[in-house]
Amino acid sequence: MKEKVILAYSGGLDTTAIIPWLKENYDYDVVCCCIDVGQGNELDGLEERAKLSGATKLYIEHVTDEFVDEYVMPCVKAGAVYENKYLLGTSMARPVIAKKLVEVAIKENAVAICHGATGKGNDQVRFELGIKALAPDLKIIAPWRCNNTWKMQSREDEIEYCKAHGIDLPFDASHSYSRDRNLWHISHEGLELEDPANAPNYDHLLVLGVSPEKAPNEAESLSLTFEKGIPVALNGKAMKASEIIEELNVLGGKYGIGIIDIVENRVVGMKSRGVYETPGGTILMEAHTQLEELILDRATLSCKKEIGNKFADVVYEGKWFTPLREALQAFVEVTQEYVTGEVKLKLYKGNIIKQGTTSPYSLYNESIASFTTGELYNHHDAEGFINLFGLSLKVRAMKMAEVEKNK
């Protein structure tokens, strides 16, 4: 009986070409494993395609709820945004994919896991760090780094290789973007996006929605309810977090919400350009941020922003299965204890407009914040505070004046 390799399989061009390549260069049975994290109709026809390409078996692991509850929600609660723009759509999906690949490898008694990430990208790092953390004894095969046997250097080469092995491709891969999709987002790279000087062809590339210019002229309002930092209802209707994201994707896409054109710094050192659509996620993150502004005290909110940035870096770099991520998440969980309330928003041509926020744990006190005189705050108290708060500035100014006088 042959040993087995588990291939992280999407049915796209790269992983389709890898199946015959593995059979040619390794004496393994190829078991494909597709992890369903909400990519929708991209799963159609996968089993037939995998077997026609030479795989012995295909697993489709449906883990959308697990992905959202255990990976997306911690990022939402942390306010994790990479380089001020990227909501980590691809990054946060990689650890759950690595985890499921390892589980299938153990079930099949496989000796190796293979992935189709290129040698220039982030995903090779994310997949392999996850696999090493969970199953250090498993061999990892990365075809794009196998220079002696992987001779394909472009999508065109892969297309010709597939044709030579009698594999019919269900798409025109030579004229398509490189995309990654899950419930949280879809990314687009390649074609005109390779040159940052080019404007994105939004009419051609957008999948989840429209550009703001083509959004309706009438705004639409919604409300989101949170409990301990987690969304639990949309417009008053109780729903799972995954269902809320799905609904918000439709609403946000309709109004051109969450489209970013970004040049980001990859883990491997180079810059890359892509267009990302995250309509539902953008709405959810904005609502969560607005609720926190009402509830968290100044010191905690300030520290949490720093932790959120670090959390984003850790997730982006593929370090999910580390003590550092666990420690950061533990801090975040404490901050979310009272992040409960309702946020009202209006969507209009790419904009998310605040319409009011309420919480039983709000620290906003109108009697204190109002410009009118109240019992809880005496305007004259500010004088002593300012004298103490500005004491160091006053002392330095006095010293500098003394220095200048003695010159």
Curated annotation (Swiss-Prot):
<keyword id="KW-0055">Arginine biosynthesis</keyword>
<feature type="binding site">
    <location>
        <position position="276"/>
    </location>
    <ligand>
        <name>L-citrulline</name>
    </ligand>
</feature>
<feature type="binding site">
    <location>
        <position position="264"/>
    </location>
    <ligand>
        <name>L-citrulline</name>
    </ligand>
</feature>
<keyword id="KW-0963">Cytoplasm</keyword>
<dbReference type="GO" id="GO:0000050">
    <property type="term" value="P:urea cycle"/>
</dbReference>
<keyword id="KW-0436">Ligase</keyword>
<feature type="binding site">
    <location>
        <position position="122"/>
    </location>
    <ligand>
        <name>L-citrulline</name>
    </ligand>
</feature>
<dbReference type="Pfam" id="PF20979">
    <property type="entry name" value="Arginosuc_syn_C"/>
</dbReference>
<feature type="binding site">
    <location>
        <position position="122"/>
    </location>
    <ligand>
        <name>L-aspartate</name>
    </ligand>
</feature>
<dbReference type="GO" id="GO:0004055">
    <property type="term" value="F:argininosuccinate synthase activity"/>
</dbReference>
<dbReference type="InterPro" id="IPR048268">
    <property type="entry name" value="Arginosuc_syn_C"/>
</dbReference>
<feature type="binding site">
    <location>
        <begin position="8"/>
        <end position="16"/>
    </location>
    <ligand>
        <name>ATP</name>
    </ligand>
</feature>
<dbReference type="Pfam" id="PF00764">
    <property type="entry name" value="Arginosuc_synth"/>
</dbReference>
<dbReference type="InterPro" id="IPR001518">
    <property type="entry name" value="Arginosuc_synth"/>
</dbReference>
<feature type="binding site">
    <location>
        <position position="116"/>
    </location>
    <ligand>
        <name>ATP</name>
    </ligand>
</feature>
<dbReference type="InterPro" id="IPR023434">
    <property type="entry name" value="Arginosuc_synth_type_1_subfam"/>
</dbReference>
<feature type="binding site">
    <location>
        <position position="123"/>
    </location>
    <ligand>
        <name>L-aspartate</name>
    </ligand>
</feature>
<dbReference type="GO" id="GO:0000053">
    <property type="term" value="P:argininosuccinate metabolic process"/>
</dbReference>
<dbReference type="GO" id="GO:0005524">
    <property type="term" value="F:ATP binding"/>
</dbReference>
<feature type="binding site">
    <location>
        <position position="91"/>
    </location>
    <ligand>
        <name>L-citrulline</name>
    </ligand>
</feature>
<feature type="binding site">
    <location>
        <position position="86"/>
    </location>
    <ligand>
        <name>L-citrulline</name>
    </ligand>
</feature>
<dbReference type="GO" id="GO:0005737">
    <property type="term" value="C:cytoplasm"/>
</dbReference>
<keyword id="KW-0067">ATP-binding</keyword>
<comment type="pathway">
    <text>Amino-acid biosynthesis; L-arginine biosynthesis; L-arginine from L-ornithine and carbamoyl phosphate: step 2/3.</text>
</comment>
<comment type="similarity">
    <text>Belongs to the argininosuccinate synthase family. Type 1 subfamily.</text>
</comment>
<dbReference type="InterPro" id="IPR048267">
    <property type="entry name" value="Arginosuc_syn_N"/>
</dbReference>
<feature type="binding site">
    <location>
        <position position="187"/>
    </location>
    <ligand>
        <name>L-citrulline</name>
    </ligand>
</feature>
<keyword id="KW-0547">Nucleotide-binding</keyword>
<comment type="subunit">
    <text>Homotetramer.</text>
</comment>
<feature type="binding site">
    <location>
        <position position="126"/>
    </location>
    <ligand>
        <name>L-citrulline</name>
    </ligand>
</feature>
<protein>
    <recommendedName>
        <fullName>Argininosuccinate synthase</fullName>
        <ecNumber>6.3.4.5</ecNumber>
    </recommendedName>
</protein>
<keyword id="KW-0028">Amino-acid biosynthesis</keyword>
<dbReference type="GO" id="GO:0006526">
    <property type="term" value="P:L-arginine biosynthetic process"/>
</dbReference>
<dbReference type="InterPro" id="IPR014729">
    <property type="entry name" value="Rossmann-like_a/b/a_fold"/>
</dbReference>
<dbReference type="InterPro" id="IPR018223">
    <property type="entry name" value="Arginosuc_synth_CS"/>
</dbReference>
<feature type="binding site">
    <location>
        <position position="178"/>
    </location>
    <ligand>
        <name>L-citrulline</name>
    </ligand>
</feature>
<feature type="binding site">
    <location>
        <position position="118"/>
    </location>
    <ligand>
        <name>L-aspartate</name>
    </ligand>
</feature>
<dbReference type="InterPro" id="IPR024074">
    <property type="entry name" value="AS_cat/multimer_dom_body"/>
</dbReference>
